Amino acid sequence: MELTVRHTGGVRFEAQTRGHRLICDQPAVNGGEDLGMTPPELLLSSLGTCAGFYALAYLKARSLPSDGLTVKVTAEKATKPARLDHIVIEVKAPGCPPEQESWIQRSIEACLIHNTLTHSPHIETVVRVGELAHVS
């Protein structure tokens, strides 16, 4: 999996992969134009949409109703180091029988983004400047 992020002016960036584009910006208070979500909002969006996809897959596989399926993700900002903490995924499936609740939760906890966040990935940062930094 690979994507490219390019600075497009101000504090705005554009991520591109597989022909798709996504704008990331900051609110005016942080010097941006508020043309897109912030990086933390995008992270929570990835988690929420992944959780929603896994919940939907579970419901569809069992011919359970998915009407009104919604996912709300909240988080608190923490410091030292700066990060998001206490992330809560709230899934609502109004037409689904209550006895499916724990099974839906298990399916959500199997999602790729959930697993990535709960099992710390190895992250390597490589910086290239000058001659080595020519953008292709």
Which residue stretches match the model-derived regions?
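Extended beta-strand/beta-hairpin segments
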Residues: 1-45, 53-136
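Alpha-helical metal-binding/catalytic segments enriched in His/Glu/Asp
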Residues: 50
